[in-house]
Regions:
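Extreme N-terminal segment that seeds HTH/winged-HTH DNA-binding domains in transcriptional regulators
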Residues: 1-31, 35-36, 80-82, 86-120
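Short, Lys/Arg-rich nucleic-acid/phosphate-binding segment
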Residues: 30-31, 63-76
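Enrichment for repetitive, rod-forming helical segments
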Residues: 13, 57, 70-72, 91
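Gly/Ser/Thr-rich beta-alpha loop segments that engage phosphate groups in nucleotides
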Residues: 7, 53, 68-70
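N-terminal helix-turn-helix
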Residues: 30-63
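Short glycine- and Lys/Arg-enriched binding-loop motifs that mark or flank ligand-binding interfaces
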Residues: 19, 24-25, 47, 62-64
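Short alpha-helical linear motifs
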Residues: 54-58, 74, 108-109
Length: 120
């Protein structure tokens, strides 16, 4: 899972975000500790801590002193919104621009998307 050119702490943060979005880390649920993440991924604990602290800074996680870090209530919806916006910028906008260049109508584009989704 941790293997691309992006910083490791960022990949840790994104994996935790994914677990929040898919529900495997519920809101108000405790997230794995820095040491657990470091041992699991075979990385430096400081790197794992940086990923967790990034999410604390974004309001996705909160700290309970002496206990650990937990998922903030509302984090799942906030992450879904943020990822949907990023998805639109990264995929939908270029798709629409290319469809315009090729004179593909919105109806045809929708039909092609429906076909692809049905094939899954």
């Amino acid at each position: 899972m941790i293997d691309d050119g992006r910083p490791l702490f960022q990949q840790i943060a994104e994996q935790i975000e994914g677990s929040i979005i898919d529900g495997s880390l519920p809101e108000d649920g405790q997230v794995p500790s820095t040491n657990e993440l470091a041992a699991f991924h075979r990385i430096n604990p400081a790197t794992a801590a940086k990923g967790l602290n990034q999410l604390v800074g974004e309001g996705i996680l909160y700290k309970k002193r002496g206990i650990g870090m937990f998922v903030t209530v509302g984090a799942r919806d906030a992450l879904r919104f943020r990822r949907r916006e990023a998805f639109a910028r990264q995929y939908i906008e270029p798709l629409v621009m290319e469809a315009d260049r090729l004179q593909i109508s919105l109806d045809e584009l929708k039909s092609r998307l429906d076909d692809r989704k049905a094939d899954r």
